[in-house]
Swiss-Prot record:
Gene Ontology BP, a term: secondary metabolic process
Organism: Stachybotrys chlorohalonatus (strain IBT 40285)
Alphabetical keyword list: Glycoprotein, Heme, Iron, Metal-binding, Monooxygenase, Oxidoreductase, Signal
Record-stated family: Belongs to the cytochrome P450 family.
Cofactor dependence: heme
Pathway given in the UniProt record: Mycotoxin biosynthesis
This enzyme's EC code(s): 1.-.-.-
Protein's name in the database: Cytochrome P450 monooxygenase ATR2
Position of the signal peptide: 1-19
Gene Ontology molecular function terms on file: heme binding; iron ion binding; monooxygenase activity; oxidoreductase activity, acting on paired donors, with incorporation or reduction of molecular oxygen
SUPFAM superfamilies: Cytochrome P450
Amino acid sequence: MAVISLFRIIVDKWHVVLACSACLGALLFQALRRQSNSTKDVPFIGMELGSAEKRRKAYMTDARSLFRDGYQQFKDRVFGITTTSENLVVVVPPRFLDELGRLPDEVLSASMAVADISQDKYTKMEITDPIISHAVRGNLTMSLSRLNDAILEELRKALSLLLPTCDEWTSVNISEKLQRIVAVISGRVFVGPELCGSDAYLDAAIHIAHEASAAVQSISTLPPWKRPFLSARLPELRALRERQDKVHSVLRPVLEKRIQMNEEDRPDDMLTWIISSQKKHGERSIETMAKVQTALHLAAIGTTSEMATNAFYNLAAMPELVPELREEIRTVLEEHDGVVSTKSLQAMKKLDSFLKETARLYPPFLAAFERKVLRTFTLSNGQVIPAGALIKVPSQAIMTDPALFPDPDRFDAFRFYDLQQQKNILKDGSVSVGASVNQFVNSNKNSLVFGYGRHACPGRFLAADELKMILVYFLQAYEIRLEEGESRRYRNLEFAAFSIPDPTKTIQMKKLQ
């Protein structure tokens, strides 16, 4: 009966069915023709794997190998890669970074690339509001020294509450502890003292990152043509929406209260800066400002806590590093009257090198400098990059290139410390010490953890200070090692171009005697 009914509908509406079929056919033909025209100048990696769907699945399970193989095979040329994106994705070698960096935002858009990667069409996270970068660049970075004492106060409280006071070796899920610690100290900067210690706030801030990641992964697993039809049904996306509502319900009353306050009475934090910046960057509704805050939590808490976990896993696997790092901390603090400040943290060169080497071998992303192409342009080698394409730079492959980093797969904690000490004679006869270019927060063509150019991560200075503060206090108070029976550093988990430390693993720690 159902078949007969369907047949009758087709007969009765034959002209509608024919028109729809023609439109769909035309759209498919145009899409295929655009794809053919746009990729005729771009060789693809992984073609031996077979169909586009097989290549997409290979990207989800082993993007690292695809980026590495493409980087080695094409080296100085652009190549295509089939990813989870609905758009053509081209991978650009670092030699083109300067010329790409000179292109205006009307040609290459960082925010639209972020929207693509975060599946914003379906997640509705709206993490590309320009007020975010304005507030971080214009207020946060300039305020770090001023907020240093407040951050340290929250850190001390969090460490005393969350880390065990153990005289014997004790197993700890350090990933869970670090997520909460980072949420507390970042929260002091983002939402101020009234919220940063609140269980409701911390629960919302920590879990929004988990649920956003799960939703993006779940959507990305679907073939692109199925996403418009099936994404809304995904339980991960529903969980994200519910969590977004909870975050907004926590932030909304605080925002309403802040708006009613006199400007001079408002606390010195990101909430206030965003409210104040509306004069320059346009009015936002309370709902939009809550979404902006949510975006900040996604960007800051998840990534920083993962970097911290990677650092702790490295220390647990290589406890022989601890005495040298601890001695540097002791020496530097003695020289700065025992004060942990931005200045004293910057003086801890070996600790800085350890973090940079951690990020080199265990970056949060396998690709960097993502940009959406808004207008077709031609590179200096003649390769045409079409409008609509998504650009990536194979950062992890670059950072493990033996031509750039000797013995690149070996973790050398003081690799960048040694480079900082090297002196180079410049053309004018002056001496240059390679300090700044090899600092953890520095971004250059060979070190792309924080991106590159004018859109490099504006929050990297806060992240660096937080990571160093956590390690300074921990290393002065605790010993650390892997679990008994474990002899190698825990492997990271990877999906597509995302890489995270395994959050289920435990390490052992005990109070320093």
